[in-house]
Amino acid sequence: MIQQESRLKVADNTGAKEILTIRVLGGSGRRYAGIGDVIVATVKDAIPGGNVKKGDVVKAVIVRTKKERRRADGSYIKFDENAAVILKNDGDPRGTRIFGPVGRELRDKKFMKIVSLAPEVL
């Protein structure tokens, strides 16, 4: 469960290392975001010479959460960290590589480019 002020690891090669959630998109009173939800965030930590720099406001999709999520078949999925992938305005990932596994929920939410770049889909 990601909400305002949540800090997430960045799971791509855009140059950002950590982002801070500004807003959860998808309704005026929406408080929490899970795997496959889009957020607006600011870059808090970045490497020099990267695609994004500290202070940039970006859109990102959540790919891993520590909070368990119940699936339709009754199973639960949770990860060791909260992580996101930075997006372009058209919804495609800004980076060219994805690090670590991503949730299967991304396939249902039509983030096929991220699913194809990911090394593992759980």
Curated annotation (Swiss-Prot):
InterPro entries: Ribosomal_uL14, Ribosomal_uL14_bac-type, Ribosomal_uL14_CS, Ribosomal_uL14_sf. One of its GO terms (molecular function) is large ribosomal subunit rRNA binding. GO terms for cellular component: cytosolic large ribosomal subunit. One of its GO terms (biological process) is translation. SUPFAM superfamilies: Ribosomal protein L14. It holds the Pfam family Ribosomal_L14. Keywords: Ribonucleoprotein, Ribosomal protein, RNA-binding, rRNA-binding. It comes from the Bacteria. Disulfide bonds: none annotated. Binds to 23S rRNA. Forms part of two intersubunit bridges in the 70S ribosome. Part of the 50S ribosomal subunit. Forms a cluster with proteins L3 and L19. In the 70S ribosome, L14 and L19 interact and together make contacts with the 16S rRNA in bridges B5 and B8. Belongs to the universal ribosomal protein uL14 family. This is Large ribosomal subunit protein uL14. It comes from Arthrobacter sp. (strain FB24).
